[in-house]
A protein has these predicted regions:
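Hot-dog-fold acyl-thioester-processing enzymes
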Residues: 1-54, 110-123
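HotDog/MaoC-like acyl-thioester-processing domains
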Residues: 3-10, 65-66, 77-123
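Short, solvent-exposed polar/charged micro-motifs at secondary-structure junctions
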Residues: 24, 61-62
Length: 123
């Protein structure tokens, strides 16, 4: 779900296909999910396609076990002419336990036109 302010929530269930050999969320899969949330938040705010220009920071704070739900929250914290900074946090949720912040990252996204060139982000 995306709001007009560029905030998005994405829910994912950690399945065996997402796990590493230790039975927890594979870091590459966590990064993929954060990138997906960043893209959707940027595209929703800009009202046009967006591409990733950079990942300026990612932290994996705690392991996420199989069967846990991952709630990703992404929001646009800065809008330039065509570029946007998107912050993403990930909360791990299990029945009967309070949510725990397990992932966070910052992504630089760029709004693009139909030819893939930078284009003004609609605000």
């Amino acid at each position: 779900m995306t709001s007009p302010s560029g905030t998005l929530e994405l829910h994912e269930l950690v399945l065996p296909a997402h796990a590493n050999h230790r039975g927890t969320l594979f870091a590459g899969e966590g990064l993929r999910l954060m990138a997906k949330a960043a893209f959707l938040a940027a595209r929703g705010l800009a009202q046009r396609e967006a591409v990733m220009a950079a990942v300026t920071g990612v932290q994996f704070l705690s392991p996420v076990a199989l069967g846990q739900q991952l709630l990703l929250r992404a929001w646009v914290s800065r809008v330039g002419r065509s570029s946007m900074t998107v912050c993403v946090t990930g909360l791990s949720e299990s029945p009967g336990t309070p949510p725990e912040e397990v992932l966070k990252g910052v992504f630089e996204m760029v709004a693009v036109d139909g030819k893939g060139r930078p284009s003004p982000a609609k605000r």
